[in-house]
């Protein structure tokens, strides 16, 4: 049986698409290989959100070109955001790649089976793409140019997929989109994310629902209320701010101010005092001075996030920022600001997790990791526990006995649902 190998970088949507493509290859008669050298087909699922990620993709492709020179029968497939909407440009740049198709698309060199392409034994926590694309065109972001405009799937279609995943063993779904808060705006009935959450909530056997990524300007009170009142919806929200300075936010074309963002957070915390918030932050955006960075730092400290995904700005081709704004913050200064935020996160999250010592939590166990069961709380905290019992897929009650900024150690109290 011929082998296939997947190399994936980037967001959870990329991982979800790679999982689906892997299942498709298996339907075509391939089996998963341990490494590229053992495969007849290698798929590269690419990301170009940051320059560092794009460089990794290009380096990987050149390594595969060398492998193909040694094994001319090897077929290389490329998808993801490196491809974008103009495949001809990629074909010219990487002529040794055999198959190229855009992000979110399916390969066209063989027949595609009808219906959902799902794993026979899906993970406990399964990714489900509910929409593609983005209409916001933030000045630094290449995603709208690569994945196109927003396109939502219907509630009925998503519901059928989730129900089938649950039937096959999943207990949680993570709803994915570049901007899930805009879900449904392009559909005839104009449903919203809150409507989708309500529909999925009724699926028997589904224990939890998560979603990402959100845009602060698009979060409605209806969504906040749905999260607060639907028990299966996790108390976890990704709320990317990108900057804490109003001038920089305007240059980014984010559509809100520091104060408006703070007011949104206050509304969310009022409705859900136990909410776990995560954010994305860019340091060193064009023209960002020390005072503007300090506004970001202060916002991070004031909100007290459970996770801060921070990155140094890098210009992306096609974007307004790359075309019209000078990348004028020195690299050494970007690195300094990056470290300050990382240190703040370690301190803030460390204190928040330490406050959980000797408390109880409900954990959905996802599987084994280094001989320990691994799962997450309703707020998304990573928890490890030891037990000889088969706990995969179980909802368990645990007691926290050790904490760190990155995870919690717990003891099993009892199994709540198996």
Curated annotation (Swiss-Prot):
User: Keyword Repressor, does the record have it?
Assistant: no
- Give the location in the cell: Cytoplasm
Binding, [4Fe-4S] cluster 2:
134, 138, 141
What cellular-component terms does GO give this entry? cytosol
Query: Which CDD domains did the record assign?
Result: Radical_SAM (cd01335)
Q: Which reaction does it catalyse?
A: N(6)-dimethylallyladenosine(37) in tRNA + (sulfur carrier)-SH + AH2 + 2 S-adenosyl-L-methionine = 2-methylsulfanyl-N(6)-dimethylallyladenosine(37) in tRNA + (sulfur carrier)-H + 5'-deoxyadenosine + L-methionine + A + S-adenosyl-L-homocysteine + 2 H(+)
PROSITE patterns listed in its UniProt record: MTTASE_N, MTTASE_RADICAL, RADICAL_SAM, TRAM
Cofactor(s) essential for the protein = [4Fe-4S] cluster
Ranges for the MTTase N-terminal domain? 2-118
Q: Which cysteines are joined by disulfide bonds?
A: none
Using the record's annotation, list all stretches that form the Radical SAM core domain: 120-351
* Domain called TRAM: residue spans: 346-414
Keyword list (alphabetical) reads: 4Fe-4S, Cytoplasm, Iron, Iron-sulfur, Metal-binding, S-adenosyl-L-methionine, Transferase, tRNA processing
Q: Does tRNA processing appear among the keywords?
A: yes
Q: According to the UniProt entry, what is the EC number of this protein?
A: 2.8.4.3
Q: Single GO molecular-function term? A: N6-isopentenyladenosine methylthiotransferase activity
What family classification does the UniProt entry report for this protein?
Belongs to the methylthiotransferase family. MiaB subfamily.
What assembly does the database describe for this protein? Monomer.
Main function: Catalyzes the methylthiolation of N6-(dimethylallyl)adenosine (i(6)A), leading to the formation of 2-methylthio-N6-(dimethylallyl)adenosine (ms(2)i(6)A) at position 37 in tRNAs that read codons beginning with uridine.
Name of the protein: tRNA-2-methylthio-N(6)-dimethylallyladenosine synthase
Origin species, per record, is Dehalococcoides mccartyi (strain ATCC BAA-2100 / JCM 16839 / KCTC 5957 / BAV1)
């Amino acid at each position: 049986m011929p082998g296939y190998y997947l190399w994936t970088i980037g967001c959870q949507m990329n991982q979800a698409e790679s999982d689906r493509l892997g299942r498709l290859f298996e339907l075509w008669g391939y089996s998963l290989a341990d490494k590229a050298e053992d495969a007849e087909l290698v798929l590269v699922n690419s990301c170009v959100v940051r320059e560092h990620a794009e460089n990794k993709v290009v380096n990987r492709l050149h390594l595969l070109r060398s492998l193909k020179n040694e094994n001319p029968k090897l077929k290389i497939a490329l998808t993801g955001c490196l491809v974008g909407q103009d495949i001809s440009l990629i074909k010219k740049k990487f002529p040794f790649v055999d198959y190229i198709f855009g992000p979110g698309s399916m390969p066209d060199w063989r027949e595609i089976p009808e219906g959902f392409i799902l794993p026979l034994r899906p993970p406990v926590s399964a990714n489900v793409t509910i929409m593609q694309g983005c209409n916001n065109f933030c000045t630094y972001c290449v995603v709208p140019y690569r994945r196109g405009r927003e396109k939502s799937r219907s509630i009925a279609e998503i519901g059928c997929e989730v129900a089938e995943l649950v039937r096959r063993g999943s207990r949680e779904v993570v709803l994915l989109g570049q901007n899930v808060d805009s879900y449904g705006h392009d559909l005839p009935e104009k449903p919203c994310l809150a409507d989708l959450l309500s529909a999925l909530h009724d699926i028997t056997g589904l224990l939890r629902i998560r979603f990402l990524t959100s845009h602060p300007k698009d979060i409605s009170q209806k969504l906040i209320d749905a999260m607060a009142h639907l028990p299966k919806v996790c108390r976890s929200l990704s709320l990317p701010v990108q900057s804490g300075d109003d001038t920089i936010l305007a240059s980014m074309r984010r559509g809100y101010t520091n104060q408006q963002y703070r007011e949104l957070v206050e509304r969310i915390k009022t409705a859900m005092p136990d909410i776990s918030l995560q954010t994305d932050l860019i340091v060193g955006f064009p023209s960002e001075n020390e005072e503007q960075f300090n506004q970001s730092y202060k916002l991070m400290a004031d909100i007290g996030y459970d996770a801060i995904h921070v990155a140094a700005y890098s210009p992306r081709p096609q974007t307004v920022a790359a075309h019209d704004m000078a990348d004028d913050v020195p690299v050494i200064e970007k690195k300094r600001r990056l470290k300050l935020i990382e240190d703040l996160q370690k301190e803030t999250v460390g204190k928040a997790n330490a406050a959980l010592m000797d408390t109880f939590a409900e954990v959905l166990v996802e599987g084994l990791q280094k001989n320990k069961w691994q799962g997450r709380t309703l707020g998304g905290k990573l928890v490890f526990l030891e037990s000889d019992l088969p706990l995969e897929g179980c909802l368990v009650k645990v007691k926290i006995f050790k904490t760190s900024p990155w995870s919690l150690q717990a003891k099993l109290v009892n199994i709540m649902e198996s």
